[in-house]
Amino acid sequence: MKPEETKILASRHLRQEKQREGQAQFKYGSHIHEWFRPKMRKAAQELPAEARIRAIRPAGRKKAKGTVITVGEGRGFVVEHRGEHLVVTASHCLPWLPSGFGIAYSEEHVYRNMLGPLGAAPTVACECLFINPIADVAVVGVPDTQTLSDEADAYRALLEYATPFRITEAPEKSRGFLISLEGEWFGCQVQWMKRIDGPLWVSKPTQPIEGGMSGSPIVSETGNAIGIVAASVMEKGKDAATDEFGASNPRLMRDLPLWLLRTQAMRKQ
């Protein structure tokens, strides 16, 4: 192996810096496709100590059967995998892509100040378990319990009372629900093309789909998660979601990793 190759593999700091620089140069959006860039929140460092970690407790829900939380400057929703709570979100809600090296240190996959209760500044760390920037899907979980025990404890304390969503296949054409910036559920139309195993199209929302909703679940009439809010289509400065097809978004049963979907299939109805 060449000396310069050894240097790249050995220095995790260089790899992290390279990933961040690359992410900063990549810009979402154009005059046609408007990606939901979430609104900035108050920095976690400005919060009083007693507000930095607080558990998410169950709340009354009319449409959904799970917990939605803050992920970075966007959102995510809780699912269960082998007794552990994980968070599904849109990959563009993460600040940078983790290293692709197979021998990377676990801390290279850790995002600090990334999770928090819905509507609050993110203060809790998480580790990236899966990411697909093409489909715009990511799954994060508890940091390593040996090397980052304090961060792992904070993660579990935050999600102690969270209710995991059940993941199911989306109907080919049906009514769905989205959650607004104010935390209210509202209706929309969802559909996908089975013959091409396509993405989930969201159209005809009863309320505007706004920046800051990235990573939120797209929910079926039965309250189960079927997709992820990721993008909106703009035409001449106006949201085109009112047309028949609207915008394409990740469909969970197509875009999530198989190791997660296998355990979802074992959950009871």
What annotation goes with each model-predicted range?
Residues 34, 41, 45-49, 54-61, ...:
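Catalytic-histidine neighborhood of serine endopeptidases
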Residues 51-72, 153-160, 181-268:
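Active-site region of chymotrypsin-like
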Residues 1-46:
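N-terminal targeting leaders that route proteins to membranes or the secretory/organellar pathways
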Residues 28, 36-43, 77-78, 97-98, ...:
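Active-site substrate-binding loop(s) of clan PA
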Residues 131-141, 172, 195-201:
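Short, surface-exposed linear segments at secondary-structure transitions and domain or protein termini
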Residues 95-96, 143-148, 204-212:
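Short solvent-exposed strand/turn elements
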Residues 79, 85-89, 115-117, 136-143, 179-181, 203-205, 219-221:
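A generic structural motif
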